[in-house]
């Protein structure tokens, strides 16, 4: 009977005997993400945004005051295929998707208006029962960010929202702070990892000296296979 021998080695010893010298590293973006990265590298921003929407990437449109976030949002939504079912959640009707017949617009109470106190978080939770293909949220402002992220991550890819921030990095930070407001009892690093795993694209808008609105930056997080 052959007795199995088990060596007691550490990783440094493995390295010393050359165990890692011929290792092949396979960390590849999936084909769709590779195409999107190629579009970005080529400076084809309009085509990148179009293909990202069609590929159902989760998108945040970020910008400061008066940078045209809602206008750009509506322009981007024209790319969404007309056969999809879209639910919008807003505190004022601004999202326009007339080319999509199967749509439902939900509106929250703003500033205590109306007899029923319906928050944005209430709308997000309600819309999940309406079985949307995508969820379009007018603007993320507070703890409803976690409900939005959870909805996006549980069967509603391709969802889009806007957020008030001056850079993609600050947009990520804003999302983290908003989710922390929900009091989930998880660490900041855990929230950061979650946000980075859910949000694929951040489109940053700026307002130029002559009032021209433009896309100043694009953040793109590739998924690996």
Regions found by a protein language model. Give the residues of each.
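Conserved P-loop NTPase
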Residues: 193-225
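Active-site/binding-pocket entry motifs
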Residues: 5-7, 94, 111-112, 224
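Short active-site-adjacent structural elements
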Residues: 9-10, 97, 171, 211-214
């Amino acid at each position: 009977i052959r007795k199995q021998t088990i060596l007691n080695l550490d990783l440094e010893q493995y390295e010393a005997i050359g165990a890692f010298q011929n290792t092949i590293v396979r960390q590849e973006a999936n084909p769709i993400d590779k195409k999107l990265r190629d579009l970005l590298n080529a400076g084809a921003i309009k085509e990148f945004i179009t293909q990202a929407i069609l590929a159902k990437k989760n998108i945040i449109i970020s910008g400061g005051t008066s940078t045209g976030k809602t206008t750009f949002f509506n322009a981007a939504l024209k790319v969404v295929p007309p056969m999809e079912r879209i639910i919008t959640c807003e505190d004022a009707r601004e999202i326009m998707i007339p080319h999509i017949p199967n749509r439902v617009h939900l509106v929250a109470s703003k500033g205590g208006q109306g007899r029923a106190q319906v928050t944005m978080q209430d709308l997000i939770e309600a819309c999940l029962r309406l079985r949307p293909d995508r969820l379009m949220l007018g603007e993320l402002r507070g703890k409803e960010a976690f409900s939005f992220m959870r909805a996006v991550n549980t069967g509603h890819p391709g969802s889009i929202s806007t957020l008030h921030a001056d850079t993609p990095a600050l947009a990520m930070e804003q999302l983290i702070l908003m989710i922390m407001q929900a009091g989930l009892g998880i660490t900041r690093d855990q929230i950061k990892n979650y946000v980075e795993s859910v949000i694929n694209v951040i489109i940053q808008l700026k307002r130029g000296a002559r009032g021209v609105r433009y896309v100043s930056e694009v953040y793109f997080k590739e998924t690996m296979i």
